[in-house]
């Protein structure tokens, strides 16, 4: 290997530059042998070498090494050395035989590279042109993708046109400085119009777009950019007012979907009775799942009530029409042309009762592969419409604030679809009260098979929704039903559930997403030969629909863990680069979704849209009607578990530190089944407490809670969201970015592996620089703080440093929970050690050192029961028992 370092003429910013005067030229004739030759009139040749046993061992050092920072004209540059290969290297045989020559060696040039780390808004905008001219196109891409987090479209245009507003429309010298400047600005504005045209959708006057048109007319008359700008303006002006979303409601308008009833149906597939579920031989019943340490944990989950009318466009099955290439995806889509009449299906249409529930399990008449394909079609269409920068933590975390109810509608649509799939699973399992346990078990088996088909199609969103619904309290507690489920189906259910295990920050689901994100087919362990043979026979290349919640939590974590500004007023652009790494993964997976080739099936779509909705209270009540609570004791749930399955699940368990003697044993057993339906909260680790009354609120309004584990006696359940720092995951809802945890003790051993760690070592390039949840890294950590209420209890993540005292942390938590009218002195901070023990943080203590670092970093912000000057009796212990006196009980409310 040859490595050369030399002084050259200075290059443009962002490109290669000389290291320093008198730099040495070195030749590495082997990986561990370096020959340095000094410049004339300097030191002689110096040879450094040692013996390396295997010449094929990879080089350990990175190709890029940071050496410092520079502050130039209000911009902080990160300085690094980067090795650039000049010629291909020698082959393995050449090196072993020693017949390599100068041309066969690896030639590297070490260059000095400057990248923008932070700067003022004016400097960041001004740097767009030099970065483009210096071949640092990544800067332009990152800026256009993330600038909405720290400025507006109007401000960027004003600063750009102010700085570069004197371009001569006709350059006297072809290729001269003026011509290069004009080409750079034209390329930047053209990229902006093509990729983010929704930024200019500001009805009714479209001021930003008209400003751009005026600038282009003056400086680039007759150019292609002028034509495209005029075309976009004409298209936006032709849209109806209702089709254009005001910028005040959302950072960028998105595709407006018409209700399904207004869209023409697509041709239906004629399914013969042979594809319906046929009678199968009697199989040995499977054991009822006792998931004390359930691997299906939704890492970025956040429970949301049903969609409000303005945000309730049902996902349609009509294929998305093609858009003009000059029009952004934010424009309104018209329905597709009327297709030919659909063929009549070979099964009866679903019958419904007065309450909207299915009277018969017509699900069994739809083959599992058909159901999975239709879910994948719906999920893929919605995921492709997601506006990636809406996932930014600074935008997504604002959705619950007043006036932001319509923020990020494309993400809300994916949330609604996830809820609808989970609701469909629960409704088909519980809706028909006349079904016997054996019939209901066939429905459960059918859904497990649908989940398997979703895995084959790499649809991690619906796969996760189905598994979450099957592990909801309402279905999990049905002992008799699970006893009738075949052992083979139950093993498949377990295997699929392991995909979303929260071990090592959901590393398995993240690795699968990296491995299969852009691959042609899924790599399966369950019947791989049969599946791969079927995939090859069809010859269809598949896309990937991820669990979007993983990306949302990663981006919210980044937004919380990294500062927006450095040194007071300099925008932290390094933070935007890391955010773009996640957004780029979303865009890549969106492109992969174009590989799906699935025909919409009209009758399944009509059946799915007509499915009634069950609230969490309704689903639990129906479950109790099928099997009264007294018959669902947790001790009987494991009665028919085989030894192998018991051992398999016990490996995920650890001895419990305390056992509950509560009479509601069945609810606590179900509480071990940690199900969390979807999506990251606005503040990294928001969680929601649910009670049997069925009322709830959340930081996101969309998630239906009908498939949430529910306690019949009103015992509080807390569902934790994932706080993963980054994910390669994508897809709409990353495979498993949310986690749930029960606040009540369990009658069976509780898993000690649920440490809620949020490390993604080896998965993301920026994970090592972020603090981990449930771990103190350096002088900071992230805690989750909730209000001391029973209903609608939302967890907010707080970044705590070693310098933060209790009043500071309390104020941060109050700001997150919108308690602006109260004073920090009115609240106290308690760490949840266990169900019955809480650690009170002293008034002026340093939270970082006062907290119990061995327990979960979960805190409660509790209003003081006494005035600050009143005398309060404290026990000798630092822990506080749960207060049950009526006089000390704090009023409960929905926040």
Curated annotation (Swiss-Prot):
Record's keyword annotation contains Phosphoprotein: yes
Annotated positions of the Phosphotyrosine modification: 795
SMART domains associated with the record: RA (SM00314), RasGEF (SM00147), RasGEFN (SM00229)
GO biological process: Ras protein signal transduction; small GTPase-mediated signal transduction
Start-end of Pro residues biased regions: 307-318
Chain ranges of the Ras-associating domain: 779-866
Keywords on record: Cytoplasm, Guanine-nucleotide releasing factor, Nucleus, Phosphoprotein
One annotated Gene Ontology cellular component of this protein: nucleus
Pfam families listed in its UniProt record: RA, RasGEF, RasGEF_N
Location in or out of the cell: Cytoplasm; Nucleus
Residue intervals of the Ras-GEF domain: 367-629
Domain (N-terminal Ras-GEF) ranges: 112-237
Chain spans, region Disordered: 301-324, 650-669, 708-754
Entry keyword annotation includes Hydrolase: no
GO molecular function: GTPase regulator activity; guanyl-nucleotide exchange factor activity
Tissue spec: Expressed in all tissues examined.
Biased composition (Low complexity): 656-667, 726-753
InterPro entries listed in its UniProt record: RA_dom, RalGDS_RA, Ras-like_GEF, Ras-like_Gua-exchang_fac_N, Ras_G-nucl-exch_fac_CS, Ras_GEF_dom_sf, RASGEF_cat_dom, RASGEF_cat_dom_sf
PTM comment: Phosphorylation of Tyr-795 by MET blocks HRAS binding.
Primary subcellular site in the record, as a coarse category: cytoplasm
Notes on the domains: The Ras-associating domain interacts with Ras.
Subunit structure: Interacts with RIT1 and RIT2. Interacts with TRAF3. Interacts with HRAS.
Function in brief: Functions as a guanine nucleotide exchange factor (GEF) activating either RalA or RalB GTPases and plays an important role in intracellular transport. Interacts and acts as an effector molecule for R-Ras, H-Ras, K-Ras, and Rap. During bacterial clearance, recognizes 'Lys-33'-linked polyubiquitinated TRAF3 and subsequently mediates assembly of the exocyst complex.
PANTHER family given in the database record: GUANINE NUCLEOTIDE EXCHANGE FACTOR (PTHR23113), RAL GUANINE NUCLEOTIDE DISSOCIATION STIMULATOR (PTHR23113:SF35)
Name of this chain's protein: Ral guanine nucleotide dissociation stimulator
